[in-house]
Curated annotation (Swiss-Prot):
One of its GO terms (cellular component) is cytoplasm. Homotetramer. Forms an RuvA(8)-RuvB(12)-Holliday junction (HJ) complex. HJ DNA is sandwiched between 2 RuvA tetramers; dsDNA enters through RuvA and exits via RuvB. An RuvB hexamer assembles on each DNA strand where it exits the tetramer. Each RuvB hexamer is contacted by two RuvA subunits (via domain III) on 2 adjacent RuvB subunits; this complex drives branch migration. In the full resolvosome a probable DNA-RuvA(4)-RuvB(12)-RuvC(2) complex forms which resolves the HJ. The RuvA-RuvB-RuvC complex processes Holliday junction (HJ) DNA during genetic recombination and DNA repair, while the RuvA-RuvB complex plays an important role in the rescue of blocked DNA replication forks via replication fork reversal (RFR). RuvA specifically binds to HJ cruciform DNA, conferring on it an open structure. The RuvB hexamer acts as an ATP-dependent pump, pulling dsDNA into and through the RuvAB complex. HJ branch migration allows RuvC to scan DNA until it finds its consensus sequence, where it cleaves and resolves the cruciform DNA. It is found in: Cytoplasm. Residues 65-143 are annotated as: Domain II. One of its GO terms (biological process) is DNA recombination. Residues 144-155 are annotated as: Flexible linker. Transmembrane segments: none annotated. Residues 156-204 are annotated as: Domain III. This is Holliday junction branch migration complex subunit RuvA. Has three domains with a flexible linker between the domains II and III and assumes an 'L' shape. Domain III is highly mobile and contacts RuvB. GO terms for molecular function: ATP binding; four-way junction DNA binding; four-way junction helicase activity.
């Protein structure tokens, strides 16, 4: 089991990063709520990971804190929720916000998450509500709002929009939906990470 990695960030392409560890490069997918907290390119990062082995691939999912990883591990145990949907859910809501939605049985907000319909939202409520009681509650104390990492300003608005649309598609949105979300909030001074963050928040 690979549970923690420490290395230099070589590439950032939401929701992916390329992490260099002693000359070896590792592709890691992160939920956007964690991606926002990454340091700049060329800087060192510590990533808490969940390793998934499939017949056709070995995949690493990364998180800023063990609390996100713990929540992801519980999410993918839910019937019909795989790693891709688990990543999308934690991109649309932080772990704390997700727990709050479960405790309040807030289906209306859950169904706004990419890939989550009414049946999936109801299943999440039934299967997750008891599971979160078994998690260490100290992991889920309120934390400060996630901060966006600054990025180079030489990216054009169009390339930022294209990158944001690509990231939303990776998180489960249909291409037309992703394009419309970005179109609705696009501004020349917004980088790709800001566009993604605003787009996800606009669905809640």
């Amino acid at each position: 089991m690979i549970s923690r990695m420490k290395g230099i960030i070589l590439e950032k392409q939401p929701p992916w990063i390329l992490l260099d560890i002693q000359g070896m490069g590792y592709d890691i997918q992160l939920p956007m709520t964690c991606f926002y907290q990454l340091p700049e390119l060329g800087q060192e990062a510590i990533i808490f990971t969940h390793f998934v082995v499939r017949e056709d691939a070995q995949l690493l999912y990364g998180f800023h804190h063990p609390k996100e990883r713990a929540m992801f591990s519980e999410l993918i145990k839910v019937n019909g929720v795989g790693p891709k949907l688990g990543l999308a859910i934690l991109s649309g809501m932080s772990s704390e916000e997700f727990i709050c939605a479960l405790e309040k049985e807030d289906i209306s907000n859950l169904i706004k998450l990419p890939g989550v319909g009414k049946k999936t939202a109801e299943r999440l409520l039934v299967e997750m509500k008891d599971r979160i009681k078994n998690l260490n509650k100290n992991l889920f104390k309120s934390t400060a709002d996630h901060m966006l990492s600054s990025v180079s300003t030489d990216l054009s608005a169009k390339s930022a929009e294209a990158e944001a649309i690509s990231a939303l598609i990776s998180l489960g949105y249909k291409p037309q939906e992703a394009a419309q979300l970005i179109k609705n909030i696009a501004q020349p001074d917004l980088d790709s990470q800001a566009l993604i963050k605003h787009a996800l928040r606009s669905t809640l």
